[in-house]
Curated annotation (Swiss-Prot):
GO terms for biological process: base-excision repair. DNA binds at Q70, R125, N169. A zinc finger (FPG-type) spans 229-263. Belongs to the FPG family. Involved in base excision repair of DNA damaged by oxidation or by mutagenic agents. Acts as a DNA glycosylase that recognizes and removes damaged bases. Has a preference for oxidized pyrimidines, such as thymine glycol, 5,6-dihydrouracil and 5,6-dihydrothymine. Has AP (apurinic/apyrimidinic) lyase activity and introduces nicks in the DNA strand. Cleaves the DNA backbone by beta-delta elimination to generate a single-strand break at the site of the removed base with both 3'- and 5'-phosphates. This is Endonuclease 8. It comes from Enterobacter sp. (strain 638). It holds the Pfam family H2TH. It comes from the Bacteria. Keywords: DNA damage, DNA repair, DNA-binding, Glycosidase, Hydrolase, Lyase, Metal-binding, Multifunctional enzyme, Zinc, Zinc-finger. Binds 1 zinc ion per subunit. Its EC number is 3.2.2.-, 4.2.99.18. The active site is at P2, E3, K53, R253.
């Protein structure tokens, strides 16, 4: 399943294709969205925002297209007028003079006014996105210590989009290894030093993954690039202490960690 960094990179590719360009065509599969097609002609996409696995496509006339990929939804960028051969069902097409972005297979799609955006049920439930560069470690620390989250085990908390949007299983695993914490620990049990380390890692590791995952550094400065330290590395030596990385199941998802140095 894609996590926040992958979803943000997908949004970047959509923005690169059509942001700031007048729309020449808009098409929606769902009848309740048909009335918006003509009003979008000539409008521009001003921003594509991510909130966890939801995308918010903001238009210049202040409406916002909300879409959630759920399990099967996928966006694609094509040349204007191109209609790819695929078994997927087209839901949305937004086209400019040279490019188009297509949404396939998703079913959770709405057009929202600014007022509706503030009261949308999913957007009200979901926490701040870890790839929102305005979010600070101090704000994350405050969320960790809030009554709602302070006594939750990290195994479940770091998968809960109400805590922080954009985290998923590989990020959960890598963040907890980076700060040397066991999945059963809770924020209420941590020292100030541990809380500070975790608060920073909850932002730094997703952002490092977003910026560098899959990037090859010719100078071999691997410490500056994201790579898996424990995810899918069961049976191998822990890079920090030499212990053997183990795989288990926590919150119904595979978990990887070092039983020696994660306490």
């Amino acid at each position: 399943m894609p996590e926040g960094p992958e979803i943000r990179r997908a949004a970047d590719s959509l923005e690169a294709a059509i942001k700031g360009k007048p729309l020449t065509n808009a098409w929606f599969a769902f009848p309740q969205l048909k009335s918006f097609e003509s009003s979008l002609i000539g409008q521009k996409v001003t921003q594509i925002e991510t909130r966890g696995k939801a995308l918010l496509t903001h238009f210049s006339h202040n409406l916002t297209l909300y879409s959630h990929n759920q399990l099967y939804g996928v966006w694609r960028v094509v040349d204007a007028g191109e209609h790819p051969q695929t078994s997927r069902i087209l839901r949305v097409r937004l086209q400019t003079a040279d490019k188009a972005i297509l949404l396939y297979s998703a079913s959770d799609i709405e057009m929202l006014t600014p007022e509706q955006l503030l009261t949308h049920p999913f957007l009200q439930r979901v926490g701040p996105d870890v790839l929102d560069m305005r979010l600070t470690a101090e704000e994350v620390k405050a969320r960790l210590l809030s009554p709602k989250f302070r006594n939750r085990q990290f195994s479940g908390l770091l998968l809960d989009q109400a805590f922080l949007a954009g985290l998923g299983n590989y990020l959960r695993v890598e963040i907890l290894w980076e700060v040397g914490l066991a999945a059963q620990r809770k924020a209420s049990q941590l020292s100030e030093e541990q809380l500070d380390a975790l608060s920073h890692a909850l932002l730094e590791i997703p952002r490092l993954s977003y910026n560098t995952r899959g990037v090859v550094d010719d100078n071999k400065h691997h410490g500056a690039l994201f790579r898996f330290k424990v995810f899918h590395r069961e049976g191998k030596a822990c890079e920090r202490c030499g212990g053997v990385i183990e795989r288990s199941t926590l919150s119904s998802r595979p978990f990887y960690g070092c039983p020696v140095c994660q306490k």
